Amino acid sequence: FNAGDKLNIIYNSWNNEDDGVPLYSCLTCTACTNACPQLVDYDSYVDIRRTLIVGGPAAEIPHTVLQAVLAAEAEEDSDADFVAVEDYPIDSNVGYYPGCVDYLDQEMVFSHLNEGDMNLGDTTSAAFTLFEEMGTEVSYLGRDFLKCCGHDQKWQGLDEVFDKLKAYNQKKIEASGIDTLVSSCAECFRTFARDYELEGVKVMHTTEYLIENGFDMEMKVEDELTVTYHDPCRLGRQMGIYEEPRQLVAGVEGVELVEMEHHGEDAMCCGVSSMMSCNENARALRVSRMEEIRNTGADMMITSCPKCVSHFECLKFEGDERHDIEILDVVSFLARQVEAKKSLAEESAVTPVSAEA
């Protein structure tokens, strides 16, 4: 992660010497900023430069259909497709936004000729499993209510599209009456917290919300399990959330949490880069990360970002046995343990009927 190379990218783009292509090769993972002794925010420079590249990033984006569908939501004529505030069932001061997980699931199936079985949408039902067990009332602010948060559009330099999405969502969130907005998506969380101006609304990642509200279900795994945790760039380096996910995972009895060589502030990026880097360079990052996972001896890799899950699952679709490890969102992992605990309790509650002689 050479900050000098980042400066060369910015300089070349300014002078139109490369048509902006190297600029879009930057993952905006903040690793170079983290390593810079002067704490220069290189990502912000790249963000600004991207908005000035004529023609935008069309040549760099692989998932064009997905991006076109989400960008189309920014237009006013799509407003009628979303439920108005007064007609939406909001009965709590806490709202949960799922992000575009269902869209990502469909895109992965489409991209891999229907061979994929990824279910990012599970994080939503998993989150509400945890909320219910905690006795916490949370209102679901679905994608029939709010539009895409605009994360990818912003980082691709499509400021006009992002501003429209932001204006629509911001108005509805503030009108909803909630004072806390929760999301399990690291990118949505970072976008709402950093790039929106939500008056009177606290934005939290689900792991933060669980810890703050005393999540402790006294869970245990049936068989001892070794797991490792992958820090998403948006959640870790950009928002400083490292311990909450680890605390939740380590709180499950029978689970041993082991760290990869690069973790925390030094964690490797999965290479997703706002869905712009589905190429050999991004693949090389995932292959290296998979090697680090194998070296830990972990049975499972847990993370807190649907894009990270999708990118690692994408690598698994290649069928290489070296990459055959379960990848799971931390919220889904916890919900799995809650369901197992409930099933065990139900089985224990059944009193066997003794046969009469």
What does each of the following model-derived ranges do?
Residues 1-146, 152-183, 189, 195-196:
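Iron-sulfur-cluster electron-transfer modules
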Residues 229:
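Hydrophobic alpha-helical positions that pack around
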Residues 203-213:
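A nucleotide-sugar donor-handling region in carbohydrate enzymes
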Residues 218-223, 295-296:
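Short, conserved loop/helix-junction motifs that constitute active-site signature segments
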Residues 106-121, 126-205, 234-250, 255-357:
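Cofactor-cradling patches in redox/metallo enzymes
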Residues 214-218, 236:
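Short helix-to-loop capping/linker segments positioned immediately adjacent to catalytic or ligand/cofactor-binding
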